[in-house]
Amino acid sequence: MSVSPVQPDPSVIGGVPKAPFVLKPNLARLFNDRASRFEALAQGSHLAPYLNFLAGITRIQSELVSALPPPEPVPADRVERARANAMPPIDRAAMGGSPDCREVLQQFFEKAEALEKPAAAAEALAQVRTADEEMLTWMIGNVMADDLPVESLAHHLYVAAAMQIQAARLAAGLDGSRLVPIRVGVCPACGGRPVASMVIGFHGAEGARYASCSCCATMWNEVRVKCLACGSTKGIGYQAVETGDEEATVKAEVCDTCNSWMKILYQNKNPSLDVVADDVASLGLDLLMKDTEYKRAGFDPFLMGY
């Protein structure tokens, strides 16, 4: 294993006149492409059982996004109030209590029964399915607060996956032009934390950097060299677990100001990268960073046990 020293990002900033601030989740492709990426990454990986399990989880997400009727959209007046006050228009606290969200949860839990899974994961799902209203509301609240109890991570994984469906559906229905920056590391659509950031190669935004919400999958434009935990543009460096750091497609962006780090993916170098799937598959980078003074700032409910 070769570890590169902390150094400035060697990549050249793309020549984009003005990248769009927000890229909304594409429901037709989001979860389907992610599932395919999980499956591809599982081939030959020592994480294959878990990656294949998450591929199954993501296939269910894709199926439900296609099968379920659209959710009640966020009211236009709420969007405008949120815009005026620099707040996200999706109410995370209220989202889990809506009837259409509860339908998503129920159908997701039912479909997850058929997944091949370890005994502990099967037991956790059974307990989630039979949870009373108070317990389910508590778990939804934890997921929406990005605060998952260590003793019940497996239970919360299922709830988080179901809530990702509902959040992405709501975010996809927003008018992206009405979203505004909130503050560093906060999704402008739902207020969630980023799982990581990505330098993209999409037409019209080549070389631009986007943070990706761990909940609703909205992507928002950020300065290329900037800490997404504290906002500092000083003391930023990069580490990788690959030979030839300049060619690495997944790196740790570290900040000496707040001693945090977050993954940055170079989709412009590898178009098949998925921010969630490749976050999980690059667990070796997390293990490397555990031996440093930096604390992970990216949030991923699928990686909370590591």
From Swiss-Prot:
Subcellular location: Cytoplasm
One GO cellular component, as annotated: cytosol
Gene Ontology terms, MF aspect: ferric iron binding
Major location category of this protein: cytoplasm
Gene Ontology terms describing biological process: protein maturation
Keywords, comma-separated and alphabetical: Cytoplasm, Plasmid
Domain of life, per lineage: Bacteria
HAMAP family in alphabetical order: FdeH
Function: Necessary for formate dehydrogenase activity.
Family named by the database record: Belongs to the FdhE family.
Protein name per UniProt: Protein FdhE homolog
Organism: Rhizobium meliloti (strain 1021)
